[in-house]
């Protein structure tokens, strides 16, 4: 029957061991496990918050990129509009300059034509008088010559 007494002794030793473990060993282990659970839960919450923040930031960045693209397109459109305005201004200015140069050319040609026409009138009148003198055979005085030339020039 030593078996029973040994069994009871082992049972008592085991009960003391369990009581000792429950009093001194289990609380730190349970505390460590609970602390680890809290840190894992906090890490998961932080990861979820970071994922949400990353998604929000990504959406914000995409929105800012879209706005920047729209602003860039507006700037390009404005630059193209300004370029077209400048080209139109230059074209109008060039047309005005061209018209002015053509007008000056016509005025110069007209003035030259009148000058040459006047010279031609004077020469034709002089030739007519010279021809008339040869036909008549006598010289007309200078005053009469001048009157005749003026009348011929006026008629031409």
Curated annotation (Swiss-Prot):
Keywords: ATP synthesis, Cell inner membrane, Cell membrane, CF(0), Hydrogen ion transport, Ion transport, Membrane, Transmembrane, Transmembrane helix, Transport. GO terms for cellular component: plasma membrane; proton-transporting ATP synthase complex. GO terms for molecular function: proton-transporting ATP synthase activity, rotational mechanism; proton-transporting ATPase activity, rotational mechanism. It is a single-pass membrane protein. The keyword Zinc does not apply. The chain crosses the membrane at residues 7-27. It is found in: Cell inner membrane. This is ATP synthase subunit b. CDD domains: ATP-synt_Fo_b. InterPro entries: ATP_synth_B-like_membr_sf (IPR028987), ATP_synth_b/b'su_bac/chlpt (IPR002146), ATP_synth_F0_bsu_bac (IPR005864), ATP_synthase_B_chain (IPR050059). It comes from Pasteurella multocida (strain Pm70). NCBIfam families: ATP_synt_b (TIGR01144), PRK05759.1-2 (NF004411), PRK05759.1-4 (NF004413). F-type ATPases have 2 components, F(1) - the catalytic core - and F(0) - the membrane proton channel. F(1) has five subunits: alpha(3), beta(3), gamma(1), delta(1), epsilon(1). F(0) has three main subunits: a(1), b(2) and c(10-14). The alpha and beta chains form an alternating ring which encloses part of the gamma chain. F(1) is attached to F(0) by a central stalk formed by the gamma and epsilon chains, while a peripheral stalk is formed by the delta and b chains. Gene3D superfamilies: F1F0 ATP synthase subunit B, membrane domain (1.20.5.620). The keyword Ion transport applies. F(1)F(0) ATP synthase produces ATP from ADP in the presence of a proton or sodium gradient. F-type ATPases consist of two structural domains, F(1) containing the extramembraneous catalytic core and F(0) containing the membrane proton channel, linked together by a central stalk and a peripheral stalk. During catalysis, ATP synthesis in the catalytic domain of F(1) is coupled via a rotary mechanism of the central stalk subunits to proton translocation. Belongs to the ATPase B chain family.
């Amino acid at each position: 029957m030593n078996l029973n007494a040994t069994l009871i002794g082992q049972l008592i030793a085991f009960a003391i061991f369990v009581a000792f473990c429950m009093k001194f060993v289990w609380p730190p282990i349970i505390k460590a496990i609970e602390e680890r659970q809290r840190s894992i839960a906090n890490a998961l919450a932080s990861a979820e918050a970071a994922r949400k923040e990353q998604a929000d930031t990504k959406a914000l960045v995409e929105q800012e990129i879209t706005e920047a693209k729209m602003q860039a397109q507006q700037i390009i459109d404005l630059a193209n509009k300004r370029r077209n305005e400048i080209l139109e201004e230059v074209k109008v200015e060039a047309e005005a300059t061209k018209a002015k140069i053509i007008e000056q050319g016509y005025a110069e040609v007209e003035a030259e034509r009148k000058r040459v026409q006047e010279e031609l009138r004077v020469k034709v009148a002089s030739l007519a008088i010279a021809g008339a003198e040869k036909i008549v055979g006598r010289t007309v005085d200078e005053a009469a010559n001048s009157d005749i030339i003026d009348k011929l020039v006026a008629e031409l």
